[in-house]
Amino acid sequence: MAENRYELNKNLAQMLKGGVIMDVQNPEQARIAEAAGAAAVMALERIPADIRAVGGVSRMSDPKMIKEIQGAVSIPVMAKVRIGHFVEAQILEAIEIDYIDESEVLSPADNRFHVDKKEFQVPFVCGAKDLGEALRRIAEGASMIRTKGEPGTGDIVQAVRHMRMMSQEIRRIQNLREDELYVAAKDLQVPVELVQYVHKNGKLPVVNFAAGGIATPADAALMMQLGAEGVFVGSGIFKSGDPIKRASAIVKAVTNYQNPQILAKISEDLGEAMVGINENEIQILMAERGK
């Protein structure tokens, strides 16, 4: 039964392919995201840029606020829990959230263990910066993977690094002989069946999105051309000068990511992008959480 549920969850996540998932803080923003063509919204009280600016401990959002967003839109609603905080996950499941993001954006609740995602009916999204992290999260029951990037910076460089790293490691696994896959599985600390899947199919067993630092239509198209199957946009939309226009442009960029003419047209006159922070100017806080 649990196995059937996991297959169903993976298929649910497949339905988001080619889509944009936007961080929203209230019903009004959620409606803007839905009108712009978002595939889903991520309900959270403080977007990554604010979490980074304020510091301190960041936790799961207020269930009342999440329910207000659920009531405002007809597209799927996601919400974040702290790494390893299975009770926050139980609460989100109780309010019938569509997806749970076990997220490094929030302060980790457990430095060693992630949530046992197989104990839940709801599909989980998890971040990964390389193939090992991705397969370990999938082994725990994640139905969807995203790059970690460095959230709240508006700097795409980390997301690019993570996506390229994932692609390189997948190609390396594909080039191994069958009998070498057992050693690869041991090195990655994952079940050999997952490594065999990557070897045979040249991709992860679940959908792989890009996240962290996506601020422009060009950023979104870049991640798609690098192999992402969709994108998460956090601070990039509602920290910009014209959120409605930018949200719509990023959705169009993901659909038309291989068409420079369309990308040029939709990139015009979007107002100020969010103020970015260069990765060399900050301490990398979030990408290193949860290995």
Curated annotation (Swiss-Prot):
| Keywords of this entry | Lyase, Pyridoxal phosphate, Schiff base
Q: InterPro entries per the record?
A: Aldolase_TIM, PdxS/SNZ, PdxS/SNZ_N, RibuloseP-bd_barrel
Task: Kindly tell me the pathway this chain contributes to.
Answer: Cofactor biosynthesis; pyridoxal 5'-phosphate biosynthesis
Catalytic reaction annotation: aldehydo-D-ribose 5-phosphate + D-glyceraldehyde 3-phosphate + L-glutamine = pyridoxal 5'-phosphate + L-glutamate + phosphate + 3 H2O + H(+)
Single GO BP term: pyridoxal phosphate biosynthetic process
Q: Which residues bind D-glyceraldehyde 3-phosphate?
A: 164
Q: Name one GO molecular function term.
A: pyridoxal 5'-phosphate synthase (glutamine hydrolysing) activity
Q: Which domain of life is it from?
A: Bacteria
Record's CDD domains?
A: pdxS (cd04727)
Q: Which residues bind D-ribose 5-phosphate?
A: 23, 152, 213, 234-235
Write down the EC number: 4.3.3.6
Q: Which family does it belong to?
A: Belongs to the PdxS/SNZ family.
Instruction: Please give the PANTHER family that the UniProt record associates with this protein.
Output: PYRIDOXAL 5'-PHOSPHATE SYNTHASE SUBUNIT SNZ1-RELATED
Q: What does this protein do?
A: Catalyzes the formation of pyridoxal 5'-phosphate from ribose 5-phosphate (RBP), glyceraldehyde 3-phosphate (G3P) and ammonia. The ammonia is provided by the PdxT subunit. Can also use ribulose 5-phosphate and dihydroxyacetone phosphate as substrates, resulting from enzyme-catalyzed isomerization of RBP and G3P, respectively.
Q: How does it assemble?
A: In the presence of PdxT, forms a dodecamer of heterodimers.
Q: What is this protein called?
A: Pyridoxal 5'-phosphate synthase subunit PdxS
The primary gene name is pdxS
